[in-house]
Amino acid sequence: MGKLTLLLLTLLVWLQYSLWFGKNGIHDYSRVNDDVAAQQATNAKLKARNDQLFAEIDDLNGGQEAIEERARNELSMTKPGETFYRLVPDASKRAQAAGQTNR
């Protein structure tokens, strides 16, 4: 009976070692779980960005308002009869802002 107990105990130790430290063991499972979580977070960010881009594409395809808004903001374009005003801060405020960014 002692040999059988020793054999079973040895088998148990070997199986536990394989479970904890062997290939596809607990450590590998934990590492893969972390990798999957990181990839899912990245995928969620990219999906949100894609949804935003698709919404912008639909907006640009759907009407002139989005195109007009981009032309006004990016190209400083105006409609006929409109006057474009650009507000420039005082020289003292510009110098103060420049001094803060250089620090």
Curated annotation (Swiss-Prot):
Record InterPro entries: Cell_div_FtsB (IPR023081), FtsL/DivIC (IPR007060)
Database matches in Gene3D superfamilies: 1.20.5.400
Record-linked Pfam families: DivIC
Periplasmic side: 22-103
Cell location: Cell inner membrane
Superkingdom of origin: Bacteria
Protein name: Cell division protein FtsB
Annotated organism of origin: Citrobacter koseri (strain ATCC BAA-895 / CDC 4225-83 / SGSC4696)
Gene (name only): ftsB
